[in-house]
């Protein structure tokens, strides 16, 4: 049975989702979880896009030990060399070079002839192969490219040294039958087909990204590209967790198995959702809150008698736990550390002390600490340890005529303390006005969302905010048992990003 490799582009294509703005620390958190998931290749970013992207790609490349780290690059020498500088320190570095091959792109975007495109493919792949051990070439807009020219372009790329050939459905235009036949056509029409791994990359504009990816596997693709939760620009990308579980459950049909650790799917989905602020729909396949829920009496009766009557996926397969009590206020440092290691987290002594202190504070107020609480706690503490400002004190009180007053004290990375107060028509508005006064921002609150992480009156709250000032928009999150504290943390998280970004572009 063939093993299907997974290439994750959450950190590159996924981050292009409107409103998503991840900082370096957040990208590294996702990269580490992708490594635990067993992703074969992770596209860490587009190194030539900006200095920030370059540094993020470089840090991920220098950190990840058990996956190939790849940078995107246009078919330009400057892009390729920049990508090399970013990922050369990786255990397994890869270049992903792309060039459009469809008539519409060649005519209106590239202003290049077919001969020019073929020459550019040859030169860029040849250069890439002289620097990188492996090179992936993508024929952008492949599904709207004339098939004979696509085959010709791919043959040029393979002969120049490309190890992986990606056939992207860039605008989500194709359907499963067409995509399957395209892979079969290339199998028959590319003389050097056997010398490369063929990959699929599907967008979801017509809602067929997962189905198209599975059709590509039927057609001979050995690598599937996509994102966690299917995030991405426009309607998103193929959701890797859906493709992986579909291959596993229906291996009788596809004669293929996903080469990832399925039990890490739920944890990866949750992490990506919380860091990006993109909420997973309750009815989403595999990772939605209702994915394993049954309300119909007939369904409930059937499941109670025999679970396979209405459930084709065991929740444990994807790491969906029963969220049982795991630690409490009497748990010691050693038990806490061992449990965090079991969940996949490792940290220095200083990091451990900070997170353990936060855990003890939570345990004093919350009766039962679950795995979901621990993941949220780790997520929050990691974010706050890396940000420019942190809240040291927060006080809110009623003034008059429904007006609230908030006093906020912030401390920056150098230990400087800033304090200010402001009023608002509600507690949250007052808190946000005070933070704005301290940071000297005049931004707009573009989005505010709150969700409970676990059940019960003592559940942790997760608040997501998006701030906008001019053309700049960033997101932030906060985790706390108190809603006002979580809201304040989220605002400081986003405001610190916004302030840094504005200073960077000035």
From Swiss-Prot:
EC code: 2.3.3.13
Record field: catalytic activity: 3-methyl-2-oxobutanoate + acetyl-CoA + H2O = (2S)-2-isopropylmalate + CoA + H(+)
Coiled coil: none
One Pfam family recorded for the sequence: HCS_D2
InterPro entries in the cross-refs: 2-IPM_HCS-like, 2-isopropylmalate_synth_dimer, AIPM/Hcit_synth_CS, Aldolase_TIM, LeuA/HCS_post-cat, LeuA_allosteric_dom_sf, LeuA_bact_synth, PYR_CT
Record GO cellular component, one term: cytoplasm
Pathways per UniProt: Amino-acid biosynthesis; L-leucine biosynthesis; L-leucine from 3-methyl-2-oxobutanoate: step 1/4
Localization per record: Cytoplasm
GO molecular function: 2-isopropylmalate synthase activity; acetyl-CoA C-acetyltransferase activity; manganese ion binding
Key word Amino-acid biosynthesis present: yes
Main enzyme class: transferase
SMART domains named in the record: LeuA_dimer (SM00917)
Co-factor(s): Mn(2+)
GO biological process: L-leucine biosynthetic process
All residue ranges annotated as the Pyruvate carboxyltransferase domain in the record: 4-266
Disulfide topology: none
Superkingdom of the organism of origin: Bacteria
Binding site for Mn(2+): 13, 201, 203, 237
UniProt keywords, alphabetically: Amino-acid biosynthesis, Branched-chain amino acid biosynthesis, Cytoplasm, Leucine biosynthesis, Manganese, Metal-binding, Transferase
Region (Regulatory domain): 390-506
Complexes and interactors: Homodimer.
Function: Catalyzes the condensation of the acetyl group of acetyl-CoA with 3-methyl-2-oxobutanoate (2-ketoisovalerate) to form 3-carboxy-3-hydroxy-4-methylpentanoate (2-isopropylmalate).
UniProt record similarity statement: Belongs to the alpha-IPM synthase/homocitrate synthase family. LeuA type 1 subfamily.
NCBIfam families recorded: leuA_bact, PRK00915.1-3, PRK00915.1-5
Protein name (Swiss-Prot/TrEMBL): 2-isopropylmalate synthase
